[in-house]
Curated annotation (Swiss-Prot):
Keywords from the UniProt entry: Aminopeptidase, Hydrolase, Metal-binding, Protease
Name of this protein: Methionine aminopeptidase
Cofactors named for this entry: Co(2+); Zn(2+); Mn(2+); Fe(2+)
Keyword Heme: no
Single GO molecular function: metal ion binding
Superkingdom of origin organism: Bacteria
Function (record text): Removes the N-terminal methionine from nascent proteins. The N-terminal methionine is often cleaved when the second residue in the primary sequence is small and uncharged (Met-Ala-, Cys, Gly, Pro, Ser, Thr, or Val). Requires deformylation of the N(alpha)-formylated initiator methionine before it can be hydrolyzed.
Enzyme nomenclature, EC number: 3.4.11.18
Gene3D superfamilies: Creatinase/methionine aminopeptidase superfamily (3.90.230.10)
The species this protein was found in: Klebsiella oxytoca
Disulphide linkage map: none
Family statement: Belongs to the peptidase M24A family. Methionine aminopeptidase type 1 subfamily.
Record InterPro entries: Creatinase/aminopeptidase-like
Length: 43
């Protein structure tokens, strides 16, 4: 956990994802996690 410039708290998290010819699977997904059907990517 870190503090931002305005002193708010912030945290970073990551998931391990495997990509195959048939799609992808999130290996680190916990039972209480929800993942959106579409993940937005902004360049």
């Amino acid at each position: 956990t870190v503090k931002t410039k305005d002193r708010s708290l912030s945290a970073q998290y990551e998931h391990t994802i495997v990509v195959t010819d048939n799609g992808c699977e999130i290996l680190t997904l916990r039972k209480d996690d929800t993942i959106p059907a579409i993940i937005s990517h902004n360049e």
